[in-house]
UniProtKB/Swiss-Prot annotation:
InterPro entries: DENR/SUI1_TIF, DENR_C, DENR_eukaryotes, DENR_N, SUI1, SUI1_dom_sf. This is Translation machinery-associated protein 22. The gene is TMA22. GO terms for biological process: formation of translation preinitiation complex; translation reinitiation. It comes from Debaryomyces hansenii (strain ATCC 36239 / CBS 767 / BCRC 21394 / JCM 1990 / NBRC 0083 / IGC 2968). Keywords: Cytoplasm, Ribonucleoprotein, Ribosomal protein. GO terms for cellular component: cytoplasm; ribonucleoprotein complex; ribosome. PROSITE patterns: SUI1.
Amino acid sequence: MTEVLPKNIEYCEVCTFPPEYCEFGLSFKRCKEWLQENQPELFEKLYSADALANATSTLSLEKEQKISQEMEKKQAKEEAKLERELQKKLSSKVTIKRIERNKRKHVISISGLEVFNIDMKKLAKTFASKFATGASVTKNAEKKDEIIVQGDVSDEAKDYIEKLLQEKALDEVKVEQIDEKKKKKPPAP
């Protein structure tokens, strides 16, 4: 018997579909650009003038126009959605709050990272190992995740978060440090 070998299938890095199915996704224009840069021979096979003429020869002119209008609308919606997400990310800010526990003990609370699709548990674990302290993920008063790190490592945490945001090409995001002190109780009369 002959051995059956598995097929090697290329996947689009933009939409994660095989390139033949990119046209059914919402990011077709970006998929097409990626395919032209990375797989020029497959691009020619799928989107050359001859291939497009063969594929559309069975469609009537009205149907073809209707389909192209629908695709343009979907692409415009997808681009607008991506633009809104980017604006939301750029307008948000990360807050690092230094909270005094006792006289010389501090914890820092890091909030505002949930917008950036960062896994909070992994980041807390990274902080715990990087700064040799305890770190956990809790919900704050607004029911949003925040990372609590024991110890006064706010400067180091700020540097690390800024570096993390730079890797995601979000240099304009503000990382704000706040120093919160406990209110002293008035002495008993």
